[in-house]
């Protein structure tokens, strides 16, 4: 979604090894093809995604884990992906109660947990400048357009993850 894409765009402004994990292959493909992300990992319920992460990081896991899902399941397990003294950052929004079944990992690895939900007024000016200067390209996020008149019949198609919709735009008359 746009929160995860925004996080990726800001990470790309720095010289970092970026690894993206997702359950939907079309999203990983989008990251590879449009954002130039070299390392993408399909999440797997059997846990094989963790082995792939270890392979990419030389067994160290990730220094920074950003969870932009807003999914309680993802947020409660992302400690598993963080390296010793790593940081876990929540930028996704959830209204559900969040528990930490992996709290022993959190303590054992001496992790830092951060959360962010809002931007400050100064941030908006910086972001607008980055977009205007072409440092961040939000145009690629809009993969589908629909006229207002076609919303009743066409909107449901955007919920089909196999379409590869990143963001849909409804055009008003």
Can you say where each PLM-predicted feature lies in the sequence?
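Mid-domain Rossmann-like dinucleotide-binding core that forms the NAD(H)/NADP(H) cofactor-binding site
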Residues: 1-46
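C-terminal hydrophobic helical "lid"/dimerization subdomain
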Residues: 6, 76-79, 121-173
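Short conserved AdoMet
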Residues: 12, 57, 70, 83, ...
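Glycine-rich phosphate-binding loop and adjacent beta-alpha segment
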Residues: 16, 72-133, 172-173
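Short, acidic/turn-prone active-site loops that include or flank metal/cofactor-
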Residues: 24, 43-49, 93-96, 118-119
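Short loop/turn segments at beta->alpha junctions
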Residues: 45, 70, 147-150
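Short amphipathic alpha-helix with an adjacent loop that forms part of the alpha/beta core around
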Residues: 46-59
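Short SAM/SAH-binding signature in class I
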Residues: 60-66
């Amino acid at each position: 979604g746009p929160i995860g894409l925004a996080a990726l765009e800001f990470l790309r402004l720095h010289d970092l090894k970026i690894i993206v994990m997702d359950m939907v292959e079309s999203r990983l493909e989008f990251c590879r093809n449009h954002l130039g992300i070299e390392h993408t990992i399909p999440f797997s319920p059997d846990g094989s995604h963790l082995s792939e992460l270890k392979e990419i990081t030389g067994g160290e896991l990730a220094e920074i884990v950003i969870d932009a899902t807003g999914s309680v399941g993802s947020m409660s397990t992302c400690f598993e992906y963080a390296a010793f003294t790593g940081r876990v950052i929540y930028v996704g929004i959830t209204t559900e109660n969040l528990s930490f079944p992996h709290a022993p990992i959190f303590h054992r690895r001496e992790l830092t947990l951060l959360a962010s939900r809002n931007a400050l007024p100064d941030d908006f000016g910086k972001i607008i400048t980055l977009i205007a200067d072409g440092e961040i390209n939000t145009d690629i996020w809009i993969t589908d357009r629909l006229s207002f008149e076609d919303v009743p019949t066409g909107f449901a198609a955007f919920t089909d993850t196999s379409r590869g919709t990143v963001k849909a735009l409804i055009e008003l008359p």
